[in-house]
Regions:
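Autoprocessing domains of the Hint superfamily
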Residues: 1-133
């Protein structure tokens, strides 16, 4: 779930809490896709990014890396550097810092019609994909 950050849309970056169903966002293939559903839930287990402090995701989020999707739960309870997939550049090294919040914050899970993820503050973050036949 995305707790804090700006999702890349066809109109430019937009705060996650403002993303609505039907909106067009940019998927991990750098293609436009439609948001089919936005689910909201409280989160306490998080991953912070040392070089991207305005991005905060839940521990169960998928993170797009140079080598494929990394499940956030696999990040050990100490800081770990990963080569993260970006929209502007092929990849970028950043240090992932798992942690626990003092109080729960709202997180948002997006379901899109294609792409397996979206760009948030420049990094690829996994989301649900639901295709229609």
């Amino acid at each position: 779930m995305i707790i804090k950050g700006n999702v890349l849309t066809n109109q430019g970056p937009k705060p996650i809490e403002e993303i609505q169903e039907g909106e067009i966002v940019i998927n991990l293939g750098n293609r436009p896709c439609r948001v089919l559903k936005v689910e909201k839930a409280d989160c306490t287990d998080v991953i912070r990014f040392q070089n991207n402090p305005d991005l905060l995701v839940s521990r169960d989020s998928g993170l797009a890396t140079r080598y494929g999707m990394l499940e956030g739960g696999a990040v050990q309870p100490h800081a770990k550097e990963e080569m993260l997939y970006q929209c502007e550049a092929p990849c970028f090294f950043d240090t992932l810092e798992p942690g626990i919040l003092d109080k729960p914050l709202p997180g948002y899970e997006l379901t899109v019609d294609s792409g397996k993820g979206v760009f948030v503050n420049g990094y690829g973050i996994g989301c649900k994909e639901e295709t229609h036949a």
